[in-house]
Amino acid sequence: MIAERPDLRHPLADLADWDERVRLMVRPRRYDHVLRVADLACRIARAAGIDEARAYAAGLLHDIARDLPDTELLRLAPPECAIDLAHPLALHGRAARTLLERWGYADPVVLEAVEDHTTGPRGGNPVSACVYVADVSEPGRGVNEDIRELALCDLEAALSRAIVSKVTYLQGRGIRVHPRTLRSYHALPCVGQDGSVPDAPRLPQPDRHPAP
């Protein structure tokens, strides 16, 4: 069932049918994660004065394509780069948007947040920021409590920390960073023209919840 949302007064708050679709599309453990992301995204949005109903909706829908086979992800979201082709899981945000649009979901703010949660917000959509931060820091992951706490008082700083940490972590291990993530990274105010960030932290990667 949908996690309690006592303060929402918005058409998007009526999500029972979509909640059931998500529950049927993902594994039980993933569904629990989805509900935690939706709840945290809603709380972050409320604290920042952002549309919390849209944040909840995007959190609920963000992983609807996460458990699809690689062949289906590639069909729904044609690769944009070599990383997509080698690691189709990176496509599950774009694939989710495609599915939702086909099923009649039409809110562009929510759809963009769903699409961007795997690679990073493209800017100009605060709901995307809420969902991205909530996804990497929801309590069930067991990591990034500092990002979660920061998000409830300074979303912009939390988003910067999450993206910088992810890029630093991947680059430190010689792993190629997705072009969309790099665009989000270089758009951050804290990133210099040479791509460096003073004292950049690394984002811990939980063992039981592989990074998307």
Each PLM stretch: what is its role?
Residues 2-27:
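Generic N-terminal amphipathic, Lys/Arg-enriched alpha-helix
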Residues 28-33:
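A short, charge-rich alpha-helical start-of-domain segment used by transcription regulators
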Residues 157-158, 162-170:
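Amphipathic, Lys/Arg-enriched alpha-helical patches that create a basic surface
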Residues 2-3, 65-73, 174-180:
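Short N-terminal signal/transit or membrane-insertion segments
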Residues 169-212:
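Charged phosphate-binding loop/patch that engages nucleotide di/tri-phosphates or the phosphate backbone
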Residues 40-43, 169:
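Solvent-exposed, charged/polar functional surfaces in cytosolic regulatory/catalytic domains
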Residues 17-25, 42-160, 203-209:
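Divalent metal-dependent catalytic cores for phosphoryl transfer on phosphate-bearing substrates
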